[in-house]
Amino acid sequence: MTDLLSRAHAVALDAADPLRGLRDAFVFPQHGDDDQTYFVGNSLGLQPRAARAMVDEVLDRWGALAVEGHFTGPTQWLTYHQLVRDGLARVVGAQPGEVVAMNTLSVNLHLMMASFYRPTAERGAILIEAGAFPSDRHAVESQLRLHGLDPATHLIEVDADEPNGTVSMTAIAEAIAQHGPRLALVLWPGIQYRTGQAFDLAEIVRLARAQGAAVGFDLAHAVGNLPLTLHDDGVDFAVWCHYKYLNAGPGAVGGCFVHARHANSDLPRMAGWWGHEQQTRFRMDPQFVPSPGAEGWQLSNPPVLALAPLRASLALFDQAGMAALRAKSEQLTGHLEQLIHARVPQALQIVTPAEPARRGCQLSLRVAGGRARGRALFEHLHAAGVLGDWREPDVIRIAPVPLYNRFSDLHTFVEQVEAWAAA
């Protein structure tokens, strides 16, 4: 009988993987003569090999055409951001007009809050999760202060209520119901960055809208990781980055979703000339006429060099399909979970929920013995060419990415944990 937790079985799974060829589409950092075992796509995705050619194309056109590159050819810069629109829409489950690649995540969050956070005397509170990513919290607190409101009274945090530090849907529902008459906005992550917990977006939308609150999501750790259905879920807005699972490079341009029901609304917004409708933009008229859909929230002309790697990555997502990627992801992360329980249960505690529907590819791990032991294991793994990442105070995050990670990589990780624990 085959040992389903053996390296030999993992190698067989790799050989049978219908997505195995996608690994060759990425550039891997090297450790000695071998590829690094890379589990940090949740922090910075690997470079698609095609990205260099697409960046070079932009540079070549800049050199050959200079300013005329804005208006010449199928990859003209005037509409370059639209080259990623359809692919992004497929990844997040949106209509093409509901998405735009622009700015960065925190900038886009401020722009969305300028439109969707409309406090009144009775309804001015914002609900977030306790332990939110710091940039989100900074943005929320600063928006409250801009409106003359005190975060101490108008920022509501939902505390973790489960043993591993995760948040139940019951706790979220109770908080929304309790504070409903005060809520102007619910802002929630698709996946919590430290614990790896995924949330039911559609249910959060339903709960928030039942109380009359707008609802938005930070999808930094969800986009390209989970299949999303933002349009059908009725999300008001969402923001995300493209440098994690979307592999668009360090500091990559961000992404934004605005539901179609807001496309032609009179929502106030922070306006800029690239948000003006395209046909009359270069008339330089003083009156702002927004482009329909999410593009109407653009401020400045797109960063074409930053968009080029995103084109390369989205082509791979189209080649694979989100359903197939998610199926492999569930297998990879489930296999990693089984290996940890079977071989290093005394060394590692899994923080992330066990139910596949409540997680993406990431497993967040605590090391027995506390922070110092955790750091020691983290440094051991790094020295061995097995790269995860560390999040204070005591979590190692391991994210097997289905585009380029293998089942045998999981064994490399667990073998190194065993070697460290035995030393």
Swiss-Prot record:
It is an enzyme of class 3 (hydrolase). One of its GO terms (biological process) is quinolinate biosynthetic process. The keyword Hydrolase applies. One of its GO terms (molecular function) is kynureninase activity. Pathway: Amino-acid degradation; L-kynurenine degradation; L-alanine and anthranilate from L-kynurenine: step 1/1; Cofactor biosynthesis; NAD(+) biosynthesis; quinolinate from L-kynurenine: step 2/3. It catalyses: L-kynurenine + H2O = anthranilate + L-alanine + H(+); 3-hydroxy-L-kynurenine + H2O = 3-hydroxyanthranilate + L-alanine + H(+). GO terms for cellular component: cytoplasm. The keyword Hydrolase applies. Its cofactor is pyridoxal 5'-phosphate. Pyridoxal 5'-phosphate binds at residues 105-106, 133-136, 218, 221, 243, 273, 301. Keywords: Hydrolase, Pyridine nucleotide biosynthesis, Pyridoxal phosphate. Pfam families: KYNU_C. Its EC number is 3.7.1.3. SUPFAM superfamilies: PLP-dependent transferases. The modification N6-(pyridoxal phosphate)lysine is found at residue 244. Catalyzes the cleavage of L-kynurenine (L-Kyn) and L-3-hydroxykynurenine (L-3OHKyn) into anthranilic acid (AA) and 3-hydroxyanthranilic acid (3-OHAA), respectively. Belongs to the kynureninase family. Homodimer. This is Kynureninase. The gene is kynU.
